[in-house]
């Protein structure tokens, strides 16, 4: 994983904001139940700040994603309540570790396809995501998840190497082949930001998939 982090940092200097740190996948390191793959980080994540010396994981200092995972039954409601009560500046290094200990306990690995932190949430072109796809495959191979959830049309299309419209493939199982090992994968509605209007569909689909 350390070699991947080095490569992610190099790509940050090419495709990300020069004022921000890259952030990485984190959670249950070995054999997680689910790998959750989002798009790319922005400076809303407090760990992207150059002065940050704590955990460099996804969604730190934000609220929407933790509320979403709680509604999916994949995160502690009590810890989510603590998050709701905090401003980004209230997130200490210790609290970030505490949040991701719960992620680990839930059997999750949370990552982004692109690790290049941006100043805002404007979408990245496909070409940049493609630069990260082989690295994400190595990351997924290392952690060996039971299921992979790709969030949004763009991430799903690039990683599954076919044109995906989540609305037409809800709950459909795809197979991602990495070095002759097959991983059960699903395309899920992007649940936050501009995708928040589809959040209830994403929750319903995840709950249904995990029942099987």
Segments (PLM) and residue ranges:
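A hydrophobic alpha-helix/topogenic segment detector
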Residues: 14-15, 171-212
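A polyanion-binding, active-site-adjacent surface
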Residues: 2-147, 153-162, 166, 184-185, ...
């Amino acid at each position: 994983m350390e070699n991947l982090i080095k490569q992610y940092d190099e790509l940050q200097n090419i495709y990300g904001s020069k004022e921000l740190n890259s952030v990485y996948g984190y959670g249950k390191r070995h054999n997680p139940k689910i790998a959750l793959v989002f798009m790319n980080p922005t400076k809303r994540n407090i760990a992207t700040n150059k002065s940050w010396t704590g955990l460099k994981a996804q969604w730190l200092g934000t609220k929407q994603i933790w509320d979403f995972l709680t509604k999916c039954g994949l995160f502690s409601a009590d810890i989510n309540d603590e998050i709701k009560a905090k401003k980004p500046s209230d997130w200490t290094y210790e609290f970030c570790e505490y949040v991701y200990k719960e992620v680990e306990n839930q059997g999750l690995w949370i990552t982004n396809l692109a690790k290049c932190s941006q100043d805002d949430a404007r979408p990245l072109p496909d070409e940049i995501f493609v630069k990260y796809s082989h690295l994400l495959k190595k990351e997924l191979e290392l952690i060996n998840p039971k299921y992979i959830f790709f969030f949004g049309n763009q991430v799903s299309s690039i990683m599954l190497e076919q044109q995906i419209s989540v609305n037409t493939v809800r709950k459909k199982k795809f197979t991602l082949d990495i070095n002759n090992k097959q991983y059960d994968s699903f395309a899920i509605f992007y649940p936050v930001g501009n995708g928040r209007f589809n959040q209830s569909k994403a929750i319903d689909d995840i709950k249904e998939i995990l029942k099987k």
